[in-house]
């Protein structure tokens, strides 16, 4: 069964444009090899970090939205953890609500006043 996921990761700011593109392609191919589909990549650009991470004040933010089996996440995150180009990552399982018809309220029986 496949699930929708969103992964946001931050690359080191000292990577050049070509190196950043190679890293993005590397992780995209890794996901595809693990069975991911519908991979959407958004390069959010270089931004200031809220606090220093591994002696870096800036980072290149990349967002991935994809559909993958649950077994694809562990190898993907392991590759990021071992990589020196990624300084932080987070994967979130997205709950996409299916449209359900509204529940019909049961009609309450009306009480009829008895006249005596």
From Swiss-Prot:
Keyword annotations of the record: Ribonucleoprotein, Ribosomal protein, RNA-binding, rRNA-binding
Compositional bias per record (Basic and acidic residues), positions renumbered to this chain: 97-110
Residue ranges of the region described as Disordered: 97-116
Highest taxon above the source species: Bacteria
Gene3D superfamilies registered for this protein in UniProt: 3.30.70.60
GO terms classed as biological process: translation
HAMAP family found in the cross-reference section: Ribosomal_bS6
Protein name (database record): Small ribosomal subunit protein bS6
Taxonomic placement: Bacteria, Bacillati, Cyanobacteriota, Cyanophyceae, Nostocales
């Amino acid at each position: 069964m496949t699930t929708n996921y969103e992964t946001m990761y931050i690359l080191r700011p000292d990577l050049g444009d070509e190196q950043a593109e190679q890293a993005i392609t590397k992780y995209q191919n890794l996901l595809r090899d693990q069975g991911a589909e519908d991979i959407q990549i958004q390069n959010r650009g270089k931004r200031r970090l809220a606090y220093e991470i591994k002696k870096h004040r800036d980072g290149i933010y990349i967002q991935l939205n994809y559909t993958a089996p649950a077994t694809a996440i562990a190898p993907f995150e392991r590759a990021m953890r071992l990589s020196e180009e990624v300084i932080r990552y987070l994967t979130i399982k997205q709950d996409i609500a299916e449209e359900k018809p509204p529940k019909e309220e049961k009609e309450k029986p009306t009480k009829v006043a008895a006249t005596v």
